[in-house]
A protein has these predicted regions:
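Extreme N-terminal starter segment of soluble prokaryotic enzymes
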Residues: 1-3
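Glycine-rich Rossmann-fold phosphate-binding loop(s) that bind the pyrophosphate
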Residues: 8-9
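N-terminal Rossmann-fold NAD(P) dinucleotide-binding loop
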Residues: 12-13
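Aromatic pocket-lining residues of Rossmann-like dinucleotide-binding sites
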Residues: 19
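Conserved N-terminal Rossmann-fold NAD(P) cofactor-binding segment
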Residues: 33-71
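Conserved NAD(P)H cofactor-binding loop of Rossmann-fold oxidoreductase domains
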Residues: 78-80
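Rossmann-like NAD(P)(H) cofactor-binding subdomain of soluble oxidoreductases
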Residues: 88-130
Length: 130
């Protein structure tokens, strides 16, 4: 089984690490928009494989969703955090665009993918993906 995690920040990297450590799948693909970020996180996580006792392959990519092709499950953690003074509506407006774009790219390469949404505000983003 293949799992994609979109967003290689603290939440996404932790999610990818947990999935790998529990041997839920044979491959995890980390995707991020920051150049080289997902690749670096993937290398860091792979270097812990022998210590943590997993053999799940972890790779990273900068926005190349073709690498996610054939994913069975995808976890969307991407989006901006709510900043001081920012309204919920402003957060929804920004993160909705991000989540829509991510979802379209995931479904394009893995039409049967099951999507789990962790981006805030979670209730609205999950409804948007549905």
């Amino acid at each position: 089984m293949k799992v994609t995690v979109v967003g290689a920040g603290a939440v996404g990297a932790s999610c990818a690490e947990y999935i790998a450590m529990k041997n839920f799948c044979s491959e995890v693909v980390l995707v991020d928009i920051k150049e080289g970020f997902a690749e670096g996180k993937a290398m860091d996580l792979m270097q812990t494989a022998s210590l943590n006792g997993f053999d799940t392959k972890i790779t990273g990519t900068t926005g190349d969703y073709s690498k996610t092709s054939g994913s069975h499950v995808a976890v969307i953690t991407s989006g901006i955090p709510r900043k001081p003074g920012m309204t919920r509506e402003e957060l929804i407006g920004i993160n909705a665009g991000i989540v829509k774009d991510v979802t379209a790219n995931l479904v394009k390469h893995s039409p049967e993918v099951i999507i789990i949404v962790v981006s805030n505000p979670m209730d609205t983003m999950a409804y948007l993906v549905h």
